[in-house]
């Protein structure tokens, strides 16, 4: 039996929704513990001081402070959270 697909049918026309990846908190921005700093696939950015990494390579703050991006050995980029010391005057 000869088979002929009906005309006008389209096999394409699908696309997946964007995954909303990227930097969520930029350098110098204040973060609190638990804030997501970067959503990524793989480790484009590596965790530095006071930054944790999730099973999906999401980087998040482990302490309150300011975000700092830096490049170290082998051209590897790191994200750290710099803790600001608060000097409270005792009255």
From Swiss-Prot:
Keywords: Ribonucleoprotein, Ribosomal protein. The keyword DNA damage does not apply. It holds the Pfam family Ribosomal_L27. One of its GO terms (molecular function) is structural constituent of ribosome. GO terms for biological process: translation. GO terms for cellular component: cytosolic large ribosomal subunit. Residues 1-22 are annotated as: Disordered. The keyword 4Fe-4S does not apply. PANTHER family: LARGE RIBOSOMAL SUBUNIT PROTEIN BL27M, RIBOSOMAL PROTEIN L27. NCBIfam families: L27. HAMAP family: Ribosomal_bL27. Belongs to the bacterial ribosomal protein bL27 family. This is Large ribosomal subunit protein bL27.
């Amino acid at each position: 039996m000869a088979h002929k697909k009906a005309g006008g049918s389209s096999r394409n026309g699908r696309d997946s929704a964007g995954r909303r990846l990227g930097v969520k908190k930029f350098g110098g921005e204040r973060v609190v513990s638990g804030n997501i700093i970067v959503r990524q696939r793989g480790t484009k950015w590596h965790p530095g001081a006071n930054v944790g990494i999730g099973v999906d390579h999401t980087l998040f703050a482990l302490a309150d402070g300011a975000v700092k991006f830096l490049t170290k050995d082998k051209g590897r980029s790191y994200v750290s959270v710099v803790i600001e010391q608060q000097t409270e005057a005792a009255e």
